[in-house]
Amino acid sequence: MEKEILYQFISMELVQFATFEDCYVENDEDIEITNKFQFSYNFVENVMCCTSSVSLSKESRILLKADLASYFGIEPSSAESLKESEDFIAPPELLAQFASLTYGSIRGVIFAKTMGTALNNIILPPNDVRNLFQTSQRFKRT
């Protein structure tokens, strides 16, 4: 990042978690992993939320769905330095950092919540998210 951005990992919220163990069949078919990231910004609190959504499926049957929201408080002077007019501009490095922290957290949540089930044998692999974020994201004050 060009300028140092100070932030604090404030909290996490498990928005959704569901398993469908009856759809799991032990065979040589690959498990498909889908993940996406969504961001929002609270201008009043200087808080950015990164939500990671993960879905695991096998042979077109959903095995697991999870959404984890992570909240990051951005230090006021850092937040001001990222504002352009009334908008907040999140650089790609910051988006990648928050996505990486959230994805790592959801990996742990999935492991912990599937303990004692057949799905615990499925380890969500690491994901280098840096290449997903090449441009800044603009958040408009509403």
Listing of model-derived features with the role each one plays in the protein:
Residues 1-101, 108-142:
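N-terminal intrinsically disordered, cationic/polar leader segments
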